[in-house]
Amino acid sequence: MTTVISKKRLIITLSIFLAISLSCQTPNKKTESSSKEVSIKILGTIQDGGMPHLGCSKKCCINYYSKGFPKKRVVSLGISNTKYNKHYLIEASPDINYQLKDLLEDNNPSKSLDGIFLTHAHMGHYSGLLNLGRESFNSASVPLFVMPKMGEFISSNGPWDQLVKLKNVELNNIFNEKEEALEENLSIIPLLVPHRDEY
């Protein structure tokens, strides 16, 4: 499904997407929204723990084991700016390997991943960063856009601090309601929303 969206609508769409927590009720098909220059791709919709969720006794989890449904991925969003050939990931989920392949159509994020935005420190939103470390991909200075509190958490706690020390990621602070211009036709405005906030 393809629709034309304005910059304002993109901001609203991102805000809504980032504020929603989904459980077993998920869409069955990939959804993509695009304009001529900027497209948004939903790369995952499942809650932090994946599918089936550990300890889940809901029908959807039980059916997953017994019927072998196709893999559903943890929440993530991809943004592509075709005018500048730039690609951004919202969240670094445990499924980051597959999600980057879906977004970039390549399994090498250093070739064309221009940044990762993290919304908060729940495991399904940042645990995929581990794949950027030296035990796996050993990336080079992938821009990581975070609120100051999240940046402090990453730079002060292992194993995340190693990503910063080894320059696998490069921290970039973003601020509530302050526009982050990525290109002349694309910017993101982070919005704080009520949500559990352990870190």
Where would I find each of the regions flagged by the language model?
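C-terminal motif of bacterial Sec signal peptides marking the signal peptidase cleavage site
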Residues: 20-23
